[in-house]
């Protein structure tokens, strides 16, 4: 199990990303559309003025059951250990052991 403080930090980052998503997307679109270097510089400064944690890249993909940050399968949101346990118990619909 991951530290509760790390999980809480990640939850806080997700909320910050949500809050600033529209503003960041608008600034990025303007930045990519601007051709004048001075305009691009000004828009870049506005992007840099946003909180660091408002960037999507800062959010860590974590297992929703244990909070582990590594070995997380995107399709399920579970770490590899939990995925294996739950698949064996039959708790994941459509997941079967492979055999050939």
Swiss-Prot record:
One of its GO terms (cellular component) is small ribosomal subunit. InterPro entries: Ribosomal_uS14, Ribosomal_uS14_bac/plastid, Ribosomal_uS14_CS. One of its GO terms (biological process) is translation. Gene3D superfamilies: 1.10.287.1480. Keywords: Ribonucleoprotein, Ribosomal protein, RNA-binding, rRNA-binding. The keyword Ligase does not apply. One of its GO terms (molecular function) is structural constituent of ribosome. Part of the 30S ribosomal subunit. Contacts proteins S3 and S10. Binds 16S rRNA, required for the assembly of 30S particles and may also be responsible for determining the conformation of the 16S rRNA at the A site. Belongs to the universal ribosomal protein uS14 family. This is Small ribosomal subunit protein uS14. It comes from Synechococcus sp. (strain CC9605).
């Amino acid at each position: 199990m991951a530290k509760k403080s790390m999980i809480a930090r990640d939850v806080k980052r997700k909320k910050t990303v949500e809050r600033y998503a529209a503003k960041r997307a608008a600034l990025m679109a303007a930045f990519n559309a601007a051709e004048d270097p001075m305009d691009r510089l000004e828009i870049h400064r506005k992007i840099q003025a946003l909180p660091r944690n408002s960037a999507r890249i800062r959010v860590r993909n974590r297992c929703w059951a244990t909070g582990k940050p590594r070995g997380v399968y995107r399709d399920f949101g579970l770490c590899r250990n939990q995925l294996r346990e739950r698949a064996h118990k039959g708790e994941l619909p459509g997941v079967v052991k492979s055999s050939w």
